[in-house]
Amino acid sequence: MALNLQGKQAIVAEVNEAANGALSAVVADSRGVTVGAITALRKEARANGVWMKVVRNTLAKRALEGTQFECLSDSFVGPSLIAFSSEHPGAAARIFSAFAKKNEKFELKTAAFEGNVVDAAMLATLPTYDEAVARLMSAMKEASAGKLCKTIEAVRVQKEEQAA
């Protein structure tokens, strides 16, 4: 589909806006995946606060200039599907990883978090906020009150030593 200049500018602005509000991004190759499967992926992504779009490589590179995801520019080779997570850093990677397990033709290219290229598998295993709080609470429950007090005291002493 041929796009006029205004259409291209609108796509660049849309992708740039999504990138500026995102915590992480994932780029994938969806060649060979059926339209029905991609539609289901889009539906799941929307439900999890993930923005995704198939974008031309040159437009994607231009849209990501000056954002924390500029490091992804080298991954835009061939058909590219880009997704931005705005609610949880691991959401897009988790959704794409699960989808790739079901669809062998779907291939994760790369992921970015806080301006750095990271392994998508690592990003997908990040705990959600609720999981992290649950882990912290269980760790605090397991530790006896004395151990917790000693740990807090040790941290206080260490910070005082660093300040001096």
UniProtKB/Swiss-Prot annotation:
It comes from the Bacteria. Forms part of the ribosomal stalk, playing a central role in the interaction of the ribosome with GTP-bound translation factors. GO terms for molecular function: large ribosomal subunit rRNA binding; structural constituent of ribosome. GO terms for cellular component: large ribosomal subunit. Part of the ribosomal stalk of the 50S ribosomal subunit. The N-terminus interacts with L11 and the large rRNA to form the base of the stalk. The C-terminus forms an elongated spine to which L12 dimers bind in a sequential fashion forming a multimeric L10(L12)X complex. This is Large ribosomal subunit protein uL10. The gene is rplJ. Belongs to the universal ribosomal protein uL10 family.
